[in-house]
Amino acid sequence: MTSDFSPEPPMELCYENVNGSCIKSSYAPWPRAILYGVLGLGALLAVFGNLLVIIAILHFKQLHTPTNFLVASLACADFLVGVTVMPFSTVRSVESCWYFGESYCKFHTCFDTSFCFASLFHLCCISIDRYIAVTDPLTYPTKFTVSVSGLCIALSWFFSVTYSFSIFYTGANEEGIEELVVALTCVGGCQAPLNQNWVLLCFLLFFLPTVVMVFLYGRIFLVAKYQARKIEGTANQAQASSESYKERVAKRERKAAKTLGIAMAAFLVSWLPYIIDAVIDAYMNFITPAYVYEILVWCVYYNSAMNPLIYAFFYPWFRKAIKLIVSGKVFRADSSTTNLFSEEAGAG
């Protein structure tokens, strides 16, 4: 006979000998180990997967295209999520405590928001690039140049970093909800609730690029169907051997658009539940249970590990580049000029 008269287990605190310490939620050893394994794996995939993308695009000259420079910058944002955000969030999620100091808590929040929005803005720029490439493949090289790609990269980073640090590092996110912030504040916690004005701006910054991406990829899909029917209609007049240059280019660009469109869809699936919850929370006095919030946050984080897997699955040139990098053949003098793809596969 136990139950009702058994003494309750002592309450655990993040810092046992500190007044005002946060309460610590403990897991049993096996669930704790599994959580560390699953969340840690996400961080490792984000770091090493995106590092492979960056090395491949910067090293191999065949991959020096405006689109791929955008992809490399996108991979850089995801790589930084894996380095500066995910390891610390892993400890916070499993231990339910923040052990890395108040100063890095602010930086962690700023990095988190900056790099995630940088990913979104890069994907929006890539959708514009793919739209031009598919709808006008012959003049595309003169319209979306390396300079234009560089401008898109610079603006994506500037707006995401400016937005993040102007809100969280200055404390502007706490205006009007000071009582809630005081109630949530404890030693060993790292929370950054957004007031209604800032969460609305956050939603708009997510919603507007998303609308642009969905519209452009919808247009790309329609154009691709039209081009496919046109090519099929002319197949009897000219066999595959006489396929025009324009048709080969269009086929290559459609394939690249499809792969990057899948990356965009994965991003939206990962992000949409979190954004919807953030908006609802701000207007419903932050009612989301902690474990639900953690799941939504990690869906966003895991997106940083997904893009390299998508590239590896759809791009033969990326798989070949990985083999060359891992085997150390990239250190050969002429490795940067290696032919990574056949003519029909395209450069992505």
UniProtKB/Swiss-Prot annotation:
Changing residue 168 to V: Abolished activation of G(s) G alpha protein in response to trace amine-binding. GO terms for biological process: adenylate cyclase-activating G protein-coupled receptor signaling pathway; G protein-coupled receptor signaling pathway. Changing residue 297 to C/T: Abolished activation of G(s) G alpha protein in response to trace amine-binding. Changing residue 285 to W: Decreased binding to spermidine. Keywords: Cell membrane, Disulfide bond, G-protein coupled receptor, Glycoprotein, Membrane, Receptor, Transducer, Transmembrane, Transmembrane helix. CDD domains: 7tmA_TAAR6_8_9 (cd15316). Residues 1-33, 91-105, 171-196, 281-293 are extracellular. Changing residue 178 to A: Does not affect binding to spermidine. Residues 59-68, 129-148, 219-256, 315-348 are cytoplasmic. It comes from the Eukaryota. The chain crosses the membrane at residues 34-58, 69-90, 106-128, 149-170, 197-218, 257-280, 294-314. It is found in: Cell membrane. GO terms for cellular component: plasma membrane. Specifically expressed in neurons of the olfactory epithelium. InterPro entries: GPCR_Rhodpsn, GPCR_Rhodpsn_7TM, TAAR, TAAR_fam. Changing residue 113 to A/I/V/L: Abolished activation of G(s) G alpha protein in response to spermidine-binding. Glycans are attached at residue 19. Changing residue 295 to W: Decreased binding to spermidine. Changing residue 301 to A: Abolished activation of G(s) G alpha protein in response to trace amine-binding. Residues 174-187 are annotated as: Extracellular Loop 2 (ECL2). Changing residue 274 to C/A/L: Abolished activation of G(s) G alpha protein in response to trace amine-binding. Spermidine binds at residues 112-113. Disruption phenotype: Mice lacking Taar2, Taar3, Taar4, Taar5, Taar6, Taar7a, Taar7b, Taar7d, Taar7e, Taar7f, Taar8a, Taar8b, Taar8c and Taar9 show no visible phenotype or behavioral deficits. They however show an absence of aversion to low concentrations of amines such as 2-phenylethylamine, isopentylamine, N-methylpiperidine and cadaverine. Belongs to the G-protein coupled receptor 1 family. Olfactory receptor specific for trace amines, such as triethylamine, N,N-dimethylcyclohexylamine (DMCHA), beta-phenylethylamine (beta-PEA), cadaverine (CAD) and polyamines such as spermine and spermidine. Trace amine compounds are enriched in animal body fluids and act on trace amine-associated receptors (TAARs) to elicit both intraspecific and interspecific innate behaviors. Trace amine-binding causes a conformation change that triggers signaling via G(s)-class of G alpha proteins (GNAL or GNAS). This is Trace amine-associated receptor 9.
